[in-house]
Amino acid sequence: MESFAYVLILTLAIATLFFAIAFRDPPKIGK
């Protein structure tokens, strides 16, 4: 169960970084 929580926190951190960069700069990913 600890590994699941660790992966969840890690994914959340990566998602936060991704959204911070995506919203700060013009979205170049996808187009």
From Swiss-Prot:
Keywords: Membrane, Photosynthesis, Photosystem II, Thylakoid, Transmembrane, Transmembrane helix. InterPro entries: PSII_PsbT, PSII_PsbT_sf. One of its GO terms (cellular component) is plasma membrane-derived thylakoid membrane. Its main location: membrane. The keyword Transmembrane applies. Pfam families: PsbT. The chain crosses the membrane at residues 3-23. SUPFAM superfamilies: Photosystem II reaction center protein T, PsbT. It is a single-pass membrane protein. One of its GO terms (biological process) is photosynthesis. The keyword Repeat does not apply. Found at the monomer-monomer interface of the photosystem II (PS II) dimer, plays a role in assembly and dimerization of PSII. PSII is a light-driven water plastoquinone oxidoreductase, using light energy to abstract electrons from H(2)O, generating a proton gradient subsequently used for ATP formation. PSII is composed of 1 copy each of membrane proteins PsbA, PsbB, PsbC, PsbD, PsbE, PsbF, PsbH, PsbI, PsbJ, PsbK, PsbL, PsbM, PsbT, PsbX, PsbY, PsbZ, Psb30/Ycf12, peripheral proteins PsbO, CyanoQ (PsbQ), PsbU, PsbV and a large number of cofactors. It forms dimeric complexes. Belongs to the PsbT family. This is Photosystem II reaction center protein T. It comes from Parasynechococcus marenigrum (strain WH8102). The gene is psbT.
